[in-house]
Amino acid sequence: ILVIATGDKAPDSKVALYIIKKFGLDKVLVETPSYMHYLVSQKMMDELFFNYSCIYVGGQALTIGKYGQEFGSKDHPHTRMLSIHSHSDHFFYFRHKLIYG
């Protein structure tokens, strides 16, 4: 098992993703909303594979950006729809290309 540490007090995502790419991995699946938000805020994510459910869920469901600085109406990245897939008649997968200002 190979273990590579990056950063002093926290992982250095740019270095970690560079190393992953050098090992031949071109795609990384990130399911942690706060880390996904971090990658977007650093302009390190080029695609967004986002799950949309047509079922309303209340409470603290919106966790993307919850622990980081939120994007405002003038500084958020735009997206272009790449594909739409459905799991059932009430659960869809939307894939977007992220476009930074």
Q: Which residues make up each language-model segment?
A:
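Enzymes that bind and transform nitrogen-containing heteroaromatic metabolites
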Residues: I1-G101
